[in-house]
């Protein structure tokens, strides 16, 4: 059964409507999962700081909610993911209250605390207070753009999986995911960005819903996400000190993967330029230097990305380091 949010509120001061939404859902006693910086947005309910929760013992998570009828996640990616996971394990409704907009986890059924990611259920409600989100660091909002443009290459990979591996494919989810990305890119390239935080939140929620429709991360996660995970591995392997975010890495990964599709004649050069210019418009990184990695690290990440998950993508059986470097040079990432 497809589960998508019953309530989606995206407006200034939306957070004051949390009690109303709970009442509409006949929920009386939620447990809030939040952080020390975002607890100030929780004025009414019992709470636990997300960094005090041990998530490795999955079966024990349901014990947190034995005295509660629902779970609310308030904050960025981690408190929302942990709240989602606790709600899933305890079979209770989850409400998402994002305080920033850096990835589509605010609305998707996916929990990305570990790799591979974990499938749960989409939030029953999403309450996005744009007054709060506008105040979040610009770097986080730029990362959100990277997560959205990655839908373009993710859907291309999904279509490739359908053709070459006879994978199940949802036309409605694929079209929805691509349209969301194109509409946001069109907005940032043709406006003064005054409404960017609100438009971004809408796009991220739509992206999350496309995942819920497909019951798979396929419409929003492809080879560009594998590249991002490979970069995370490089950080750990070589002790690289960079504060690059998931969405930023996915944005740069999208440029690299789009170059491969361009060479195979499966994407228009205008679309590739649109992706790059959209990232630039919101000051998201488009080069290795802006991400904080040297050229060799990016080449290694791109050449190893295919091995991180059993998922068919344009990377197929992998690129040599030489070919990876060529792709990165042609896309002007290095």
From Swiss-Prot:
Catalytic activity: sn-glycerol 1-phosphate + NAD(+) = dihydroxyacetone phosphate + NADH + H(+); sn-glycerol 1-phosphate + NADP(+) = dihydroxyacetone phosphate + NADPH + H(+)
Summary of the function given for this chain in its UniProt record: Catalyzes the NAD(P)H-dependent reduction of dihydroxyacetonephosphate (DHAP or glycerone phosphate) to glycerol 1-phosphate (G1P). The G1P thus generated is used as the glycerophosphate backbone of phospholipids in the cellular membranes of Archaea.
Family: Belongs to the glycerol-1-phosphate dehydrogenase family.
Origin: domain of life: Archaea
InterPro entries xref list: G1P_dehydrogenase_arc, G1PDH, Glycerol_DH
Keywords carried by this UniProt record: Cytoplasm, Lipid biosynthesis, Lipid metabolism, Metal-binding, NAD, NADP, Oxidoreductase, Phospholipid biosynthesis, Phospholipid metabolism, Zinc
EC number: 1.1.1.261
Main location: cytoplasm
Gene Ontology MF, one: metal ion binding
Pathway: Membrane lipid metabolism; glycerophospholipid metabolism
Sites where the protein binds NAD(+): 77-81, 99-102, 108
Record text on cofactor binding: Binds 1 zinc ion per subunit.
GO CC annotation terms, alphabetical: cytoplasm
Keyword Endoplasmic reticulum: no
Identification of the protein by name: Glycerol-1-phosphate dehydrogenase [NAD(P)+]
Cofactor(s) annotated in UniProt: Zn(2+)
Gene3D superfamilies, alphabetized: 3.40.50.1970, Dehydroquinate synthase-like - alpha domain
Gene behind this protein: egsA
GO biological process, one term: glycerophospholipid metabolic process
Record field: transmembrane: none
